[in-house]
Each structure stands twice: as C-alpha cells, then as structure tokens.
UniProtKB/Swiss-Prot annotation:
The central domain consists of 12 alpha-helical domains (19-40 residues long) with coiled-coil structural patterns. The keyword Ion transport does not apply. The gene is wac. It comes from Enterobacteria phage T4 (Bacteriophage T4). Keywords: Chaperone, Coiled coil, Isopeptide bond, Late protein, Virion. There is a cross-link at residue 100 (Glycyl lysine isopeptide (Lys-Gly) (interchain with G-Cter in host protein DncV)). It comes from the Viruses. This is Fibritin.
Amino acid sequence: MTDIVLNDLPFVDGPPAEGQSRISWIKNGEEILGADTQYGSEGSMNRPTVSVLRNVEVLDKNIGILKTSLETANSDIKTIQGILDVSGDIEALAQIGINKKDISDLKTLTSEHTEILNGTNNTVDSILADIGPFNAEANSVYRTIRNDLLWIKRELGQYTGQDINGLPVVGNPSSGMKHRIINNTDVITSQGIRLSELETKFIESDVGSLTIEVGNLREELGPKPPSFSQNVYSRLNEIDTKQTTVESDISAIKTSIGYPGNNSIITSVNTNTDNIASINLELNQSGGIKQRLTVIETSIGSDDIPSSIKGQIKDNTTSIESLNGIVGENTSSGLRANVSWLNQIVGTDSSGGQPSPPGSLLNRVSTIETSVSGLNNAVQNLQVEIGNNSAGIKGQVVALNTLVNGTNPNGSTVEERGLTNSIKANETNIASVTQEVNTAKGNISSLQGDVQALQEAGYIPEAPRDGQAYVRKDGEWVFLSTFLSPA
C-alpha cells in the first residue's frame, strides 16, 4: 500500500509554511471593491473569500485522495480475507491458533523423527567404523565390500557340486583355490601310492640278482666318468627332452624359412634385414617401442619398490594372504562367519539379487527412508507454505496484522497507525470535513448572494473601525470568524 499524500492548504490564518500564504483579510479603512464582472472574483471584498474557496478546493481534492485510498484499503482487506480463508463464525485469531497447534504437533513429530534418524546415523557410523576406510596406497583396486567378498569367494573357488556360497549345485565343477588344492591332493595321493608300490617291490626283490644285473648294466653303460653330475636316467631324459625340442625347433625352422619353397633363404634374409632395420628404427627412435618399454619396465619395477607395479603386486599378495587369514577357512570362522552373521542381521542389498528379508537392517532402513522421505516432503511443503516472519502464510499474517493494527496509534502515517485506526479516524475526519465543506459552501453561497445584493444596491455601509475583520450578512456586519464558524 502506498502512502497517502494530502495537499497542504494554500492559505492559512497563522504563520504560513513553505508554499503557503496568509489569508489577506479586509482591513479597516480599505476600500471595499467587488468584482468587475458578474462572474469575476477580483476585488478586496472577494479576496479572503477566494482564499477560503481555494482552501475548500484543496480539501475537496484531499477528500478524493482519501476516498481512493479507502477504496484501495477495502480491496486489500477483501484480499486479506480471501488469503486468510476465514469463513462462517471462525475468526482469524482462532484459525491462527489452530495453525499454531498444528505447527507445534509437526515440530514434536519432526523432533521424534530426528531422534530416530540420529539413532540410524549412529548405527550407520558404527558400521562404517567397523568396515574401515579405503586405503588407495595399499589397495589399488576399489571395490565395495560385497564386490570384494565376491572376488575373494571366486578366488577361493568351490568344491564339486557346490557354488561359491557353499550351496549345493548338481553338476557344478570345482574352481579356484579349492580346485587346485583338490588336484594337488590327488597328485600327492597318487605319488604316495607309487612310493608304496616301489617300497614293496624293493622289499620283495632279490638283492644278489640285483647285484649281477647292476654289473651287467655297468658293462653295457661303460665305466663311470670321473666327474659324475647326473645319473643315466636324468641324462637320457634330458636328451629325450632336447631331442623333442630339437625336432620341434627344426620343424619351426622349416616352417619359418619356407622349406621346401620357391623363395631362397638369402632373399628372405635380405627382406628380413630390411624389416629388422625398420623395426630397429621403430624400436630405437625417440618415443619408440624401446623407450616406451623402458618406461613400462620402470613402471613395473621390482618387489622392493612399493610404488612400482611389482611392488604393488607384492603388497596386494601380502594383503590377500592376510585377508585369507582374516576371511577364514569356512563360513564358521573369520570374516566369512562375520559376513554370514551380518547377512542375516543386515540383509542382502540389491546387488545380491535377493530382497532384504523382513526384520533385517536394510529392510528396516529402507522402510525408514521411505517414511522419512515422505515426512521430509510433507514438512518441507508445510514449511514453505507457513514460511517465516517475512514470507509465506506466517509472513502474510504478520504483515497483515501490522498493516491492520499498526505499530504506533499516534503515528503520522497510515502504516504506523494501522488500517483500523486510520479508517476510524478518516471516517470521523471525513464526516467533519464534509460538514465543514457543506457549511463553507452554504456560507460562500450566502456571501455570493450578499455580494450580488450589494452590487445591485450599489451601497455598502462602512464596517466598525475596531480592528476586527467583518463581513456583511443579512444586511449587517458580522465577525468573519463567526461567519466562518457558526454556532
């Protein structure tokens, strides 16, 4: 709402302010002159009356301004009533009291949910503390706990007829470390059987005949060399192995040189020489394969350099060995037992492919999240609608309450006095101003009639010379103050 700005009276009887003038009353001894024309307002007789008329015109404009302001205020009040939506016998204060109670209930409910959320947050923080932080230096690959456990399960593998979780699966082969352990166990068992058979045969054999056979074998093999390093079987096995390798190499050489073929070896060698030169250039030039390989070798490094790949692999191997000890041998020891227990308590998440069982932490957290999400949305919507002292319903109520009741009943502006006080004062002032205007209009009409009569009579007796201001009324002189403010 804009401020009501009223125009100041142009003429006053007391000391004038800026932009005002004193009323020039008729003085004793002054020649009384009327208008020169029938509808003119000049002349000393008309001078104070014209000043009063100008004041009346300003008052009329001010009344129009007040009327416009009142119409605007009435429109604003109707708008306020529409915003408050107060109908029937329910008053605005009662409605505000209901809203206050609802807000108090919401605060209590929000406090309860805050306590629940704090408890949930403490539980989650405790779980996070038990899990521990991720160390990127010690573990270069980031996985979630479930993915890490899944990776460990896959590395550990499964027995025949089971899956990695130990559940029976018909026809499922063994895999991972369990598969290798089973194979090693089978090999060790077969070696034990062979050793047992050899021991049995040695015990049952004839040592004398063995001596003769050994002598015959020595004659066939020849004398023992002075520097004995390997036995005959080892050397024969080595020769057989080398023979197989030589035959494979010869076959590979034939295939490589294209034997038998049409191209001569020298042609192929020259071509290869050119290709090798090109390859050497590619290898040795700046940014070539050799330089890049050096960078790769530096990156790979060695076990004693922690930042190198080998160093990280060593750290990972050590960590995995430690993890294997921490994880446990089966589902009844180590982390596997803890994880099995946690799976029952916490429940499986979405990556497990199974819904969280009722009563598990994940199921309860999911239920709480759904409830809290709905409550948060409802509370946020209510907070937005209710607002604060400067916005929303609360802000509008505060602003309207201030606008209606004001801040200072004796203030100089409508906002300070309030709409209620201003309207009451304006009603009183308008009634008084209306009465004064009507009286002034009547007096002016009477003055105009008197002036007209004087003009027609052509004679006006002189007023008393006692220093008072007089006007003519009903054929005689009366005080101007009495004329303007009749009893």
